């Protein structure tokens, strides 16, 4: 894989955004930059504590901002530059939105001494369902009338 000539520059930008956030607030030290074809589309920081939102990780906030900037949930061709190793939630959001590449500056090992490793989430997801800490159980419940998914399929373009 060819090296991204902007990777170091954008990773430094993500680290600087995270550092500014740390100095201003009490949020975790994470920043993210999203670019498409060499142009920055979004820059975001962790806002979990400020927003009382456990999903407001820097990468999630950047994905949201990029989608709004592009007026599309399709982030194909985009690259994420994250100050830290993405957690499973953020990585999944990037997969679902079509992000092409992800670069990170600080590894899980770098973050572990500070309680900032995402490793626990990856370990938990890799476990069989019956061995996970949190119960995840499907119950085959349906409402009377039209099926939910069939109704959605009937109003959604085939490409969705």
Positions of PLM-derived features:
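Short beta->alpha transition motifs characteristic of CBS
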Residues: 41-48
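Residues at secondary-structure transition points
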Residues: 5, 28, 49-57, 85
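Helix-adjacent hinge/juxtasegments
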Residues: 55-56, 60-97
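Short beta-strand scaffold segments in enzyme catalytic cores
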Residues: 30-38
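Small-residue (primarily alanine) positions within well-ordered alpha-helices
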Residues: 14, 18-21, 32, 58, ...
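Zinc-dependent deaminase
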Residues: 1-23, 86, 93-160
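Residues that line or immediately flank small-molecule/substrate-binding pockets and catalytic motifs
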Residues: 48, 82, 106
